[in-house]
From Swiss-Prot:
The gene is aroB. CDD domains: DHQS. HAMAP family: DHQ_synthase. Its main location: cytoplasm. Its cofactor is NAD(+); Co(2+); Zn(2+). GO terms for molecular function: 3-dehydroquinate synthase activity; metal ion binding; nucleotide binding. It comes from Nostoc sp. (strain PCC 7120 / SAG 25.82 / UTEX 2576). The lineage of its organism: Bacteria, Bacillati, Cyanobacteriota, Cyanophyceae, Nostocales. One of its GO terms (cellular component) is cytoplasm. This is 3-dehydroquinate synthase.
Amino acid sequence: MTSVINVNLPTQSYEIAIAPASLDQIGQSLAGLKLGKKVLLVSNPTIFKHFGKVAVDSLEAAGFQVASYSLPAGERYKTLNSIQKLYDIALENRLERSSTMVALGGGVIGDMTGFAAATWLRGINVVQVPTTLLAMVDSAIGGKTGVNHPHGKNLIGAFHQPRFVLIDPQVLKTLPVREFRAGMAEVIKYGVIWDAELFNQLEQSKRLDQLRYIKPELVDAILTRSCQAKADVVGKDEKEGGLRAILNYGHTVGHAVESLTNYRLLKHGEAVGIGMVAAGQIAVNLELWQQADADRQNALIEKAGLPTKLPVGLDIEGIIEALQLDKKVKDGKVRFVLPTQIGVVTVTDEVTSDHIRQVLQQM
C-alpha cells in the first residue's frame, strides 16, 4: 500500500511517496513530473551494487537518458571536492536546466546531490530516493543540502527542495544494523519535539535496535509519522526562520561531537542521540523539563542501541568551542532546542557555557 504525504510550500510543493517495492517504478514516477530527459543518478558503490541497475533500467524504460556516478561512502567525503566531481560529470553529460539529479543513497549522498543540483546552472531538478532510515525520515525531506567544512558540519549549503521523494521501506532490509540504529535517533527526536503519540508507540515496542524485532505496523508508523512531522514543520517554515529550528534538537552538541571526531568515530544518528541526552539534561537543570521525561527519552535512546555517553577522552572544552561555529548561533549566542514536555520544545539562547559544561562532565 502506498502512503502519500504532501509537503506544502509557497514556492514548490511536492509529494513523499512511501511504497513497498517501488524502486522499479522510479522511472514511471518521474515521467509524471514532466522533467527534462537527461538524468544523473548519484549513489555510492554499495548502494549502486544493490539497487543501481533496477533504478537505471526503470528510468531508461520511461524514456530518460541516464548517466550514473558513484561517490565514496561516508561523512568525511561530504566535501567541495566531491561536489566538483559531480559538476564534472554534469558537464560531460551536458545537463541542462530541465535535467534532474537523482540521489539514490543515504543522507550524505542526498545532501551532496541536492547541493550540486542547487548550484549547477543556478539550480536544476533533484529527486530524493533515500536508502537509509535516517535519510527516509529526515534528510531527504525539506530541501536542506550542503557539505562540510573542516571546521564544522554543513557550513556550506543551500535550500533546494526536491521535486519528489520516493521511499521504498523494503530497502531497509538491506541496511546494516548500525545504520538502522542511527536512523532511529531521528525518529525518537520527532517523538520528543512534535509527536507524543509516536513517542508512546516507540515506548511500547520491546526492542528498537533491529528492524526484524519491530512489528510491521510500527515500522509503517515510524516512516509515515516521522515524514508527516517533518512535512508539517517544513510546510510552516521552509527556510528555518523560526519553527524549523526545532528539528535541530540534539544536533547542537551532536554536530560538535561529530566535528571533533573528524566524522570517523560516530554515525550522525549516534552523535544526535548523545546530543539529545545532553540537551534533555540541560532542560532539566534549567527546570524546563521533568527528570522523569528525560529518563524516558534516554531509555528509548538506549533501547535503540544508541550511545548516551560522550566518547572516552573527548575534550569538553573543545566541544564548547566548536558550538560557537554552529549554524544556529545568533549574535554570538548558541541557540539550543530544549524540551518542555514530550512532544513540545522551545528554542532558547540562555544556555551558558557553564550549563553545557556541567552536563557534559557527567557524560
